[in-house]
Amino acid sequence: MLTTPTRFVALRIPFRSSNKIPISIAPSPKVFPRKPVIRVPASLRFVATMSTPAAAVNATVTVTDAGRGSITHVIFDMDGLLLDTEKFYTEVQEKILARYNKTFDWSLKAKMMGRKAIEAARLFVDESGISDSLSAEDFIVERESMLQDLFPTSDLMPGASRLLRHLHGKGIPICIATGTHTRHFDLKTQRHRELFSLMHHVVRGDDPEVKEGKPAPDGFLAASRRFEDGPVDPRKVLVFEDAPSGVQAAKNAGMNVIMVPDSRLDKSYCNVADQVLASLLDFKPEEWGLPSFQDSHN
C-alpha cells in the first residue's frame, strides 16, 4: 500500500469519448483487508503521484491490484536489471556512431533495450541513418569484438543479490528470461555463477522456443512453462524488467510487471508497468503477497 501522500489522476484511454463512466467503491478484503478500494472500468487508468522529489524515478507509480497478493512465481530480466551491462552497450555504440559523426541518444537506446541482437542491430543502423555504410550483421560483428572483453567485468545491480537470495531462501520459484544469447550470458555471469545458480532455469534469446524477441511474449511464456508446476497462471507471475520492450512483453504474456528503469529513460516509457521503482532495493515483497525481507533496509 502507498504510505506517502498520494494524488490520483484519472486518465481516460482512449481520450476521444466524453461520456461519464461510473466509479464505485467496494470493499476488497483479499487485497486491502478492511479498506475500501476504487473499482474502475478498464477504460480508466489511475496514476498515483507520490509526494517525493521530482528527480526520483519512482515518483510515479501505476496502481493496479490485479496480481497483488497472488504472486507465486517470479521472472527476472537480466541486462540492466540484475547486471549492470547496459553501460557497455552504450559505450560501444557511441564509439561506432562517432565514426559517422553521429550521436547515440536515449530515444534509440530505449527502442533497442531488451530485444534480440539482430532486431536491435537493425533498429540501430536504420534509425541512426548509417544502414548504407554499415549493415546490421556487420554492426553485430564489430560490436561483439568490442563487448567480449567488457562483459566478464559485469557488476551486480543494487539489491539484486539481496532479492534473489531472499526469494530463493523462502522457496519462491525464480528464473531468468533474457534476450541475451548463450555465449554472452556465460561471459556476463562468469563472476556471479553461484548467485545465478539459484535460478530454477534460464531462457535465453537463442532458445528455440523464443521465435520472436521482446516485446513479443515468447520468452516469458517459455519461462512460465518450464517451472516444475508450469505453465503457471500468468496472473500469478511477477516479472522484473528495466526495458520498455520487456515490460510490454510481460504485459503481452498477461503477467504482472515491475519496472526498474535507468534514471535517464524518459518517464513516458514507464506508463505500462504495474509498479515503477528506482532500485530493486525499493521492492517490498509483502505488497505482492510474498514473504517480507528480514533485514532492516528501508
Curated annotation (Swiss-Prot):
It catalyses: sn-glycerol 1-phosphate + H2O = glycerol + phosphate; sn-glycerol 3-phosphate + H2O = glycerol + phosphate; 5-amino-6-(5-phospho-D-ribitylamino)uracil + H2O = 5-amino-6-(D-ribitylamino)uracil + phosphate. GO terms for cellular component: mitochondrion. Optimum pH is 7.0. Its EC number is 3.1.3.21, 3.1.3.104. Signal peptide: none annotated. The lineage of its organism: Eukaryota, Viridiplantae, Streptophyta, Embryophyta, Tracheophyta. The gene is GPP1. Acts as a glycerol-3-phosphatase with higher stereospecificity for L-glycerol-3-phosphate than DL-glycerol-3-phosphate. Can also dephosphorylate in vitro 5-amino-6-(5-phospho-D-ribitylamino)uracil, also known as ARPP. Mg(2+) binds at residues 77, 79, 242. Keywords: Hydrolase, Magnesium, Metal-binding, Mitochondrion, Riboflavin biosynthesis, Transit peptide. Residues 1-46 form a transit peptide. This is (DL)-glycerol-3-phosphatase 1, mitochondrial. The keyword Calcium does not apply. It holds the Pfam family Hydrolase. The active site is at 77 (nucleophile), 79 (proton donor). Belongs to the HAD-like hydrolase superfamily. DOG/GPP family.
